Amino acid sequence: MISIELVPFPISDFIRQQSGNVLSEREASMMDFCHKLGQVYAGFIDDNFVCCWGLIPGSFVSNQAYLWMWSQGPITHQFTFIRRSQIQVQEMLKRYPTIIGHCKRSSRSAQRWLKWLGAEFEPATGDILSFTIRRVS
């Protein structure tokens, strides 16, 4: 069974409850700051925490948002994860016609996942790839 929950603030406490003390203080601070700027969701498969993600709008009137995602390790149930991700991104694109973000160039699995979601990549800057996902009219 798949479920998605809106996560109460702060996200770092939620992750500690689900996965133990896996975040550094810097990571916890960054994620809590992202959480202050937008809503955060958590995905579960068979009641097991899989990942969390959120959107950070550029402003109150912005038509684009920054997508971030965190998981403790490799995602299992990949087909289910990709399909649910596609559904979630389509919902996000109803609110924000453009979604932007970054991933590591060395993370081939993240790039494949983002391509399944419709991401277009810009040339790499060091180990960072910028991506854009646009609403199709």
Predicted regions span which residues?
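A conserved beta-strand-loop-helix scaffold within acyl/acetyltransferase catalytic domains
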Residues: 53-62, 121-122
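Conserved acetyl-CoA-binding loop-helix of GNAT-fold acetyltransferases
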Residues: 77-91, 112, 116
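Conserved beta-hairpin
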Residues: 37-55
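C-terminal "cap" of GNAT-fold acetyltransferases
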Residues: 127-137
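Short amphipathic alpha-helix that is part of the acyltransferase structural core
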Residues: 1-28
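Short loop/turn motifs at secondary-structure junctions and domain boundaries
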Residues: 32-36
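Conserved acetyl-CoA binding element of GNAT-fold acetyltransferases
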Residues: 62-76, 129
